[in-house]
Regions:
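Intrinsically disordered, low-complexity, repeat-rich regions
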Residues: 1-138
Length: 138
């Protein structure tokens, strides 16, 4: 089993949870759940990079992904540490598609060894995040 907290410095983890609570109407429990899901997603995207899986998180988890990306220093350092010195690009698509990619991505994360908070992912199964098809990004 993989644990998202093992991939993020405790101080950075606490900071991202605080940023989520500052910017959104989330309590600490919800902010922690979201950041857990975001880290699981990002690490899986790194692990599966180049495989053409077209991973895409839903809008709910994407809130925490964007919060981390906007904390650029910490996101850059995380990419550097876990992606062999490279930077995991985020290239959102303009239009949303509804192709089942959110559900597929949650299963890829589970298959990669992370515990999936299915309720967070299921909320967006009928939707799609704005990830570019056929890109090596997230």
């Amino acid at each position: 089993m993989c644990f998202p907290r093992d991939y993020v410095d405790p101080g950075v983890w606490a900071r991202e949870v605080q940023l989520l609570m500052r910017d959104y109407p989330f309590d600490e429990v919800m902010a922690t759940r979201l950041f857990h899901a975001a880290v699981s997603y990002l690490i899986t995207a790194i692990d599966k990079w180049g495989q053409g899986l077209e991973m895409c998180c839903g809008r709910t988890v994407d809130i925490a992904v964007h919060t981390f990306i906007l904390d650029t220093r910490n996101y850059r350092e995380s990419c550097h540490r876990h992606f062999d010195g490279r930077f995991l690009e985020h290239i959102p698509e303009i239009d949303f598609t509804y192709d089942g990619s959110v559900e597929r991505t949650a299963q890829i994360i589970a298959d990669n060894g992370f515990e999936v908070d299915w309720k967070l992912w299921e909320a967006d199964y009928g939707k799609c995040g704005p990830c570019r098809p056929r890109e090596n990004c997230h």
